[in-house]
A protein has these predicted regions:
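Catalytic core of pol beta-like nucleotidyltransferases
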Residues: 1-22, 30-36, 47-96
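Short hydrophobic/aromatic beta-strand micro-patches
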Residues: 43-45
């Protein structure tokens, strides 16, 4: 099973590749209770140089690198008034 540091390094590499500003890792890997079956949950803060269509390529690349299923979203896709938004900001681990 990949360590949290290995996952964070893979995300950093992909943030640079796709010109995104930062990301939040959330879910079981952020909480430290991931199992071998856990997926990766990532919110991307794209910024002005990030093409929103690249979120799919970033997720595919992360899945290929880690061998994990990946749920990735660009922050603009998340309703800021939702419980989901609050949850990712409360438990998320920032990666830049």
């Amino acid at each position: 099973m990949l360590t949290k540091d290995e996952i964070e390094n893979a995300i950093r590499f992909l943030l640079r590749k796709y010109h995104a500003e930062s990301a939040l890792l959330f879910g079981s890997y952020a909480r430290g209770d991931a199992t071998p079956e856990s997926d990766l949950d990532v919110i991307v803060f794209g910024g002005k140089h990030f093409k929103k269509t690249n979120i799919f390529a970033l997720a595919e690349d992360l899945q290929e690198i880690t061998g994990k299923n990946v749920d990735a979203f660009e922050i603009s896709e998340v309703d800021p008034n939702s419980a989901f938004y609050d949850s990712i900001h409360r438990e998320g681990v920032k990666i830049a």
